[in-house]
Amino acid sequence: MSALTIFTESEATTPVWYSMDAAEMAEKLGSKGVRFERWQADRDLGDNPDPETVIGAYQHAIDRLVAEKGYQSWDVISMRADNPQKEALRSKFLSEHTHGEDEVRFFVEGAGLFCLHLDGHIFQVLCEKNDLISVPAGTPHWFDMGSSPHFTAIRIFDNQEGWIAKFTGDPIADGYPRLP
């Protein structure tokens, strides 16, 4: 189940706030400019769907965001435990970084952990199937897919280039809880 855990920047072992209630999560994240919503990922995609199948199944959701925010491109990221690149990708995503655009993800299956570095706190957002998260441009963050990843998410972009990270060099991500 989706969850939001908040830590202070100086204390990575004891949370100061926790909730699994989507409305509470949306309110707390919204106060920081982060969009969090529960959408319906109700299409049967099979065991290992190709990107075209995922896009086709959720084109209506993509169209809604494009109409609302003017996004220009989208793709699908899908990761499974048997992917030979999983360790390299996990390592890359675990380094704190920012983007020059919003980072928008709609989870259509599985789960992943977004960790947002905001105002002296770390907001850990466990996103699961049905979750839409939009992290504002310039927000320092990292993403953990776990050591045995299983997720499929639609990524939506402001530009045609797709995912472009600017790494901060801050090792803060190393001290916070990760997915198993």
UniProtKB/Swiss-Prot annotation:
EC number: 1.13.11.54, 1.13.11.53
Enzymatic reactions: 1,2-dihydroxy-5-(methylsulfanyl)pent-1-en-3-one + O2 = 3-(methylsulfanyl)propanoate + CO + formate + 2 H(+); 1,2-dihydroxy-5-(methylsulfanyl)pent-1-en-3-one + O2 = 4-methylsulfanyl-2-oxobutanoate + formate + 2 H(+)
Gene3D superfamilies the UniProt entry points to: Jelly Rolls (2.60.120.10)
A GO term, aspect molecular function: nickel cation binding
Site label Important to generate the dianion, positions: 105
Amino-acid positions noted as binding Fe(2+) in the UniProt annotation, renumbered to this chain: 97, 99, 103, 141
SUPFAM superfamilies: RmlC-like cupins
Enzyme class: oxidoreductase
Pfam families in the record: ARD (PF03079)
Record site feature (May play a role in metal incorporation in vivo), residues: 96
Record site feature (May play a role in transmitting local conformational changes), residues: 102
Keywords: Amino-acid biosynthesis, Dioxygenase, Iron, Metal-binding, Methionine biosynthesis, Nickel, Oxidoreductase
UniProt pathway annotation: Amino-acid biosynthesis; L-methionine biosynthesis via salvage pathway; L-methionine from S-methyl-5-thio-alpha-D-ribose 1-phosphate: step 5/6
Cofactor mode of binding and number, as noted: Binds 1 Fe(2+) cation per monomer. Binds 1 nickel ion per monomer.
Cofactors named for this entry: Fe(2+); Ni(2+)
Residues involved in Ni(2+) binding: 97, 99, 103, 141
GO BP, sorted A to Z: L-methionine salvage from methylthioadenosine; L-methionine salvage from S-adenosylmethionine
Similarity comment: family membership: Belongs to the acireductone dioxygenase (ARD) family.
Known partners and oligomeric status: Monomer.
Functional description taken from the UniProt entry: Catalyzes 2 different reactions between oxygen and the acireductone 1,2-dihydroxy-3-keto-5-methylthiopentene (DHK-MTPene) depending upon the metal bound in the active site. Fe-containing acireductone dioxygenase (Fe-ARD) produces formate and 2-keto-4-methylthiobutyrate (KMTB), the alpha-ketoacid precursor of methionine in the methionine recycle pathway. Ni-containing acireductone dioxygenase (Ni-ARD) produces methylthiopropionate, carbon monoxide and formate, and does not lie on the methionine recycle pathway.
UniProt name for this protein: Acireductone dioxygenase
Gene assigned in the entry: mtnD
